[in-house]
Regions:
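Metallo-beta-lactamase
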Residues: 31-33, 97-99, 136, 146-238
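Short catalytic-loop micro-motif centered on adjacent basic/acidic residues
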Residues: 25-28, 54-56, 155-157
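Conserved beta-strand hairpin/beta-sheet module of binuclear metal-dependent hydrolase folds
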Residues: 1-48, 168-179
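Active-site HxH/HxHxD metal-binding segment of metal-dependent hydrolases
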Residues: 31-35, 42-148
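Beta-strand-turn-beta hairpins that frame and shape the catalytic cleft
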Residues: 1, 17-24, 129-154, 170-175
Length: 238
């Protein structure tokens, strides 16, 4: 079962996704000292004897990447993966991107968080599975069962909220990690930097074609665990 921890600015749904035994991957760690929850994810992992194999970013907005410095300090060997079109939002170029966004949101007090954003270690490539994405970045999971579990998670490039937004889908377990693309009763904003109404529409059509409507949805904010068909029932009203 996917565990959800609300972290960082705006209470991002940080996801701990089990693979096999103690192994898992972490999606959108947002915990940071300025938000008073910098140890929320690392404590959860250690208290449950979990071993993260990757930090996965559904996109590069400041509220979803705030926890990267803390996570990399605790687990320096664990790779960070993001779509190449959002890659410049972290690493050396990340501070400039994030500073502009948080200033526009009136959150300049958070700027310190983004001074040491780690670089991306690999790309989340559309149509690939997480095992292949890790392998291409030079990382070996080191556990055959965990590797097989990673192969079940496929990457869907879903631009619209940002150019590098992605979703993750496990067809076997019918779990769908939607980032800020699909929410309960809403779709992602397109009025921020890198957003696009037309690309969002295309991405929602792609999700409709690709993902079972019985899949349980884990978005980047708010309610988790609803069936995808509930979103498309809502969407049909427009």
């Amino acid at each position: 079962m996917i565990s959800v921890i609300h972290t960082g600015p705006y209470g991002v749904n940080t996801l701990i996704v089990p693979l096999s035994g103690p192994y898992d991957f972490v999606v959108d760690p947002a915990c940071c000292s300025q938000c008073g929850d910098e140890r929320a994810v690392t404590s959860f992992l250690k208290n449950n004897s979990y071993i993260p194999l990757a930090f996965i970013l559904t996109h590069g907005h400041y509220d979803h990447v705030a926890g990267l410095p803390v996570m990399k300090e605790a687990y320096p060997e664990v790779p960070v993966l993001i779509h190449e079109k959002d890659r410049e939002r972290i690493g050396k170029s990340g501070f400039d991107f994030q500073s502009a966004d948080i200033a526009a949101a009136g959150l300049s007090s958070l700027a310190e968080v983004y001074k040491n954003l780690p670089e991306s270690d690999g790309n989340l490539t559309d149509g690939s599975n997480l095992y292949d994405c890790l392998k291409e970045s030079g990382v070996n999971a080191g556990n055959a069962e965990a590797e097989e579990a990673l192969k079940k998670w496929s990457v869907l490039w879903t631009p619209g909220h940002t150019m590098g937004s992605v979703c993750l889908y496990n067809e076997e377990s019918e779990e769908f990690i939607s980032g800020d693309t699909v929410f309960y009763g809403a779709w992602g904003r397109t009025d921020l930097a890198g957003g696009s109404d037309s690309l969002m529409a295309d991405s929602l059509k792609k999700i409709y074609r690709t993902v079972k409507d019985s899949a349980l949805v884990y978005p980047g904010h708010d309610y988790c665990g609803f069936e995808l068909k509930e979103f498309f029932t809502f969407l049909s009203r427009f």
